[in-house]
Amino acid sequence: MWKREKMWMIKPPTEHPKECKYRPVLESLVPRDPMSRFSLKRSSPKEEFPNLDRNYTLMGAILDLHMYTRQFNRATESGVIFDDIIRPGLEDPGLLNGPKSVGCLAGDAQSYILFCDFFDRIIESYHGYRVTSDAVQESDFNYDNLKGGDYFDEDYVLSCEVSAGRAVDDFCFPVHCSRGERRNLLALAQTVLEQLSEDLPGTFHSIEELSCESEERRVVMDSPPSSLIKTGVARDWPDGRALWLSKDGSLAIWVNMEEHLKLVSFRSDGNLQEAFKCVCINLMKTEILYKKLRHPFIWKHHLGWVVSSPAEVGTGLKTSVTVKLLHLAENKRLKDILDRLRLRMEETACDLSVCLYDDDRRKRALVSGYVTVIPNLNATEALQPWLDRGCPGIYNISNLQTIGFNEVELTQLVVDGVKLIIRMEKRLENKSSIEDLVPTKK
């Protein structure tokens, strides 16, 4: 009764002529939910939740049904869903006593925004750095600010390496990109590196060409590393991949491997200062060249330089020094010392995929995880020392985190840490105590 009597008091919404006219246009401008474009035959999140038993990655430790449910129906504009993000950790679950990996890869830059609940926790767990909206990741390429990196005790330091990864805007990351995207990235990189060669002479090698002409070019080429195969980054190998090498052997630039671009400088004399300087200078040059082509490197104010692996966001920088340690490696306080120094120490292992021989027989070597440039020797004889370098007592010491510090600060941590570790090793050789050398938390 009340409804019939009072209905006249309820006025219908007022419709303005212009609103009626432009409503279809306005509605067409509303971004469409990317997930609505898919017709995936999936069950409920509970039924689709992955089996994480015996998964020893950070993804396996952090992911639960509640978080999985929140991410389940989300997709980025390029079609990355949450199952794509965690698939690397499901394919490679890690080992119980092995190094802890993140167990996930971003498919594109938007992944870090759309799946921020998950990625922020991964970053905090791996780097010990809490991501906040008001935090700003700083960057510093002033290599002159690095102190003491030009000299290490050569009786202990065998070599050093500095590498930096970058992702190019408007392209999906390697784990998700299409063949066409990868080839476009290759063409873009070739244009940039041709211009870079005007300042630092170098040669551009397509991995596909190297595989076909290995006998003529004296190149030893193996299959891609197992880590790239498991994560799906090695799809369509070797299509769209390339290597640029400077003629003086100071710099290697990888295209479309783990990242869109990776610069590596290796020094067999242990001069970390020069390796860091080489990467900084050429990284800034390539950044300018990519900007001119309207494809800048991806930067987020709270994450810094964004790449596919959350283990490398921030600076994308890895600084490593190969050292000989026979005593400290067996010390029970080693893990605590490394934690205090914010460093990681791993036994060396040969991960050799490409071997280029020097035509002019100059004594030089460049190692970047995939490539070694060595003197012109018989292939078996030349490779044997590198295949044997996983011997006990030889370790790589590198920065543990890549975010929360700028490039100079991270490299300085490695310089200071390695020098302190060498002092401890000398003490232990003389059977003396190292307790007074144990540092406070950096």
Show the residue positions of the predicted features:
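Short glycine-/aliphatic-rich beta-strand segments at the starts of folded cytosolic domains
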Residues: T319-L325
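Long, Pro/Ser/Thr-rich low-complexity/intrinsically disordered regulatory tracts in eukaryotic proteins
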Residues: W2-G304, S309-P310, L317, A329-R361, ...
